[in-house]
Amino acid sequence: MTEATQAQPAVPRLTSLSHGGGCGCKIAPGVLSELLKRATPPALFPDLLVGTETSDDAAVYRLNDEQAIVATTDFFMPIVDDPFDFGRIAATNALSDVYAMGGKPILALALVGMPINVLPHETIAAVLRGGESVCADAGIPVAGGHSIDSVEPIYGLAAIGVVHPSRVKRNAAARAGDVLVLGKPLGVGVLSAALKKNQLDADGYAQMVATTTKLNRPGAELAALPGVHALTDVTGFGLLGHTLELARGAQLTARVHYASLPWLAGVETFVADGVFTGASGRNWAAYGTDVRLADGLPPVAQALLTDPQTSGGLLVACAPEAVDDVLACFRADGFDRAAVIGEMVDGPARVDVA
């Protein structure tokens, strides 16, 4: 057999090279909170409008009375095996934090860590092209970045956006009486677990990629709506974790209506069969003491509510009279599953699910 006809080594599955994937590989919220407590607090800068105080989605720094910079970074290990899709999902997820602050992205830098001697260069290039395609869709350049040779594949972006200082939307400004609206269906972590176990069919994969590559573009328009008080996105800490951040920031109780939650097709069946991520359990261990689950919820409820979302939906807290405008804003951009899922009420800083 000549060298030209020798069988080439099989390219490993991207997900086989990482111990976690997507936002499910975040440091557990309880551990992260403890680490941040030990960090040196930043000096007080009057123009730093948003820092680390409430675990918000991005930093915001005021340049002048008309402009503020939104700065964020997000990267993770593969949630899918297709390199182009991996790049698209990671980039969409990174840009989401800019939208979640009410901002508009203007620039991105690529963050790349790859096992250079394990993956073919064309595979790595496909990851980069995937990220670039999403940034092109968002109307921004990937203007540079940084790369390292790493044991596990890692990809993401540092993203810069702009926002008017008066339109910055924090995760700590919800008010009693506000209605909670969620932009995307839940269950990405469950589908990713099914994929890793070779249990996800083509339709399931297609819906997972479709939701995780849909840019949360309505964020800037939502921030401009009267009556929108708080905004965040649902990612690695699951719906309960990010709703709890709203509750803690506002010192209110968030009520979530389980029957109103939108789910990706098949996720409830997968969880009933024992298919879900380890991050779900870590999330519950971190914040479950501040959650009340009503009697009578399905047995799968806890795992689904703590399911880590990668490139998840925007979560809006708005006045009741703004709900129709919020839903219209989502649906105008193709978010057909956007739904009212609960409300904020006076009470201790926790989440009640009924």
From Swiss-Prot:
- What chemistry does it catalyse, as a reaction equation? hydrogenselenide + ATP + H2O = selenophosphate + AMP + phosphate + 2 H(+)
The active-site annotation reads C23
| Keywords, sorted A to Z | ATP-binding, Kinase, Magnesium, Metal-binding, Nucleotide-binding, Selenium, Transferase
Task: List positions binding ATP.
Answer: K26, T54, S55, D56, D74, D97, G145, H146, S147
Q: Which segments cross the bilayer?
A: none
Identify the NCBIfam families for this entry. Answer: PRK00943.1, selD
Q: What does this protein do?
A: Synthesizes selenophosphate from selenide and ATP.
User: What name does the UniProt record give this protein?
Assistant: Selenide, water dikinase
Q: Which organism is this entry from?
A: Burkholderia orbicola (strain MC0-3)
What high-level taxonomic lineage is stated for the organism?
Answer: Bacteria, Pseudomonadati, Pseudomonadota, Betaproteobacteria, Burkholderiales
